[in-house]
């Protein structure tokens, strides 16, 4: 068995594999190992663009950051992005195909060699590889063509750690049931079990752990407590994304429209941790209320989500609030929705070839097959209404979109990239704005000025200049916290022994 790798497989989706892989990567990095994550296939709308313009899943970006290395699409060679009844397939960072659900099995057969080649390239660069599976590892109906779980472990001869989530209940049955559905050779590959998301006192749980070990004849390597770590989520299945009422009266209230195909919600993680700012995800008029700012985020299917906004009456309510003075802000697909017209004559997004936008910005968007994926340095070139100190602020982020937006005479540039190209506009009064730039709020100076202007307008206490920590420093603190909790509760020495290090 190859002793340079290890693979975390799950009893189900969302058991915490991604977080545990990030934890082990940071633990090993702190011991001076050159370590990299790897996940053959990801299914997520929450993607990232690397320095070389490749698209990859956010989970492997987090794991790369935990490993203190530059993210590479080789770490996640296959990314599936479901949208409008079909799925966009990203291979090694570039659009490969759009497929129907019934085509998955045939696709996997084609991509198996590409996955192995990507793994080999990563393993040649790093001492240790920590792999992650996808969903549950014992889906017997998918087993023959699966390239992300046990077949991947066998392909690269990796020992396996099985991860189970106790918080959802039935943890013992899920572990035993999963192992029983594996073949004898597959079970032999499983060298340990981690029970994740435990609440309560461990001493009361220890007899159950011992009984489990007696049944499965595999050691439980630890019980990971249910603890909050402020790191980017893999997809939108998160407690953060839900309708909320506005909280304290002294908070700036920002309502983010929860779109059906919402993508890249990590754009707002920074806002979530600013004192005196209340972030709400809203999907009905009942919860919209009267916020200080409405943000329409990115989406994998702009036209369909725009139609849903109209059907739910949220579109009308957003327009009314804008007319009464609420700042409306759009990012990527949300930016396109704010315009006058969206044209999709090539059927890039689906079968709707034309849709009127909200009409708040004088832009028209035409979708095409070419997908823009690039990291961007940019600058704010216009202040907004009542937000007077953001002009000339530098921005760093990324673009990831289909479509080109043509700017009309009743809109003015809001953001330009380093080459002078307009990547965001506002109306002439500065009361509505949008941009293609993801990650805009990760630029601390811009966000400090943006939030303080809102606070000043409401006579709230302002943020100090250093109150909003540098994003990279904050993330690093969270990875260290995660690594410590992992080391305190999981038998890292045993994991290293399994890996042969």
UniProtKB/Swiss-Prot annotation:
What's a single GO MF annotation on this record? ABC-type vitamin B12 transporter activity
Q: In which pathway does it act?
A: Cofactor biosynthesis; adenosylcobalamin biosynthesis
GO BP terms: namely:
cobalamin biosynthetic process
Q: Which residues form the active site?
A: 332, 438
Specify the signal sequence span.
Answer: none
Question: InterPro entries under this entry?
Answer: Class_I_gatase-like, CobQ/CobB/MinD/ParA_Nub-bd_dom, CobQ_GATase1, CobQ_N, CobQ_synth, GATase_3, P-loop_NTPase
In terms of Pfam families, this protein maps to: CbiA (PF01656), GATase_3 (PF07685)
Q: Which UniProt keywords apply?
A: Cobalamin biosynthesis, Glutamine amidotransferase
GATase cobBQ-type domain mapped to chain residues = 251-446
Q: Which domain of life is it from?
A: Bacteria
Gene3D superfamilies listed in its UniProt record: 3.40.50.880, P-loop containing nucleotide triphosphate hydrolases (3.40.50.300)
**Family, as annotated:** Belongs to the CobB/CobQ family. CobQ subfamily.
- Function in brief: Catalyzes amidations at positions B, D, E, and G on adenosylcobyrinic A,C-diamide. NH(2) groups are provided by glutamine, and one molecule of ATP is hydrogenolyzed for each amidation.
- Protein name as catalogued: Cobyric acid synthase
**What is the originating organism of this protein?**
Clostridium botulinum (strain Alaska E43 / Type E3)
């Amino acid at each position: 068995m190859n002793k340079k790798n290890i693979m975390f497989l799950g009893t189900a989706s969302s058991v915490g594999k991604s977080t545990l892989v990030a934890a082990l990567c940071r633990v090993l990095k702190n011991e001076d190992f050159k370590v990299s994550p790897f996940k053959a296939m990801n299914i997520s709308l929450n993607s990232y663009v690397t320095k070389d313009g490749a698209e990859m899943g956010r989970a492997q970006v987090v794991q790369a950051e935990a490993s203190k290395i530059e993210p590479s699409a080789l770490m996640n060679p296959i990314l599936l992005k479901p949208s409008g009844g079909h799925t966009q397939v990203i291979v090694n960072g570039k659009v490969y195909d759009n497929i129907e659900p019934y085509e998955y099995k045939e696709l996997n057969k084609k991509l198996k060699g590409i996955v192995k080649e990507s793994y080999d390239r990563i393993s040649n660069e790093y001492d240790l590889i920590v792999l992650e599976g996808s969903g549950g590892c014992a889906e017997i109906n998918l087993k023959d063509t699966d390239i992300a779980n046990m077949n991947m472990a066998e392909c690269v001869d990796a020992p396996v750690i099985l991860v189970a989530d106790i918080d959802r209940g039935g943890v013992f049955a899920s572990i035993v049931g999963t192992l029983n559905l594996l073949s004898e050779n597959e079970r032999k590959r499983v060298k340990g079990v981690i029970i994740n998301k435990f609440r309560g006192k461990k001493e009361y749980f220890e007899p159950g752990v011992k009984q489990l070990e007696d049944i499965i004849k595999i050691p439980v390597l630890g019980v990971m407590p249910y603890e909050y770590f402020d790191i980017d989520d893999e997809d939108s299945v998160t407690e953060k994304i839900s309708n909320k009422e506005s909280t304290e009266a002294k908070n700036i209230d920002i309502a983010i429209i929860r779109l059906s195909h919402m993508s890249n919600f990590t754009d707002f993680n920074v806002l979530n941790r600013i004192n005196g700012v209340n972030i709400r995800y809203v999907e009905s008029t009942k919860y919209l209320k009267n916020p200080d700012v409405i943000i329409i985020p990115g989406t994998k299917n702009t036209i369909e989500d725009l139609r849903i906004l109209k059907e739910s009456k949220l579109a009308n309510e957003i327009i009314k609030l804008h007319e009464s003075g609420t700042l409306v802000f759009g990012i990527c697909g949300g930016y396109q929705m704010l315009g006058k017209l969206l044209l999709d004559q090539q059927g890039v997004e689906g079968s709707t070839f034309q849709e009127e936008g909200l009409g708040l910005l004088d832009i028209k968007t035409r979708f095409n097959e070419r997908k823009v994926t690039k990291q961007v340095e940019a600058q704010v070139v216009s202040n907004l209404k009542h937000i007077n100190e953001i002009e000339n602020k530098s921005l760093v982020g990324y673009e990831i979109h289909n479509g080109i937006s043509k700017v009309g005479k009743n809109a003015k540039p809001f953001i330009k990239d380093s080459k002078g190209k307009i990547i965001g506009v506002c109306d002439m009064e500065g009361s509505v704005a949008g941009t293609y730039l993801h990650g805009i709020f990760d630029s601390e100076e811009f966000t400090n000025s943006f939030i303080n202007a809102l606070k000043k307008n409401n006579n709230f206490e302002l943020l100090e200049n250093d109150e909003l920590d540098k994003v990279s420093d904050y993330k690093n603190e969270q990875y260290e916290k995660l690594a410590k909790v992992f080391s305190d509760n999981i038998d890292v020495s045993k994991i290293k022994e399994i890996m042969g290090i």
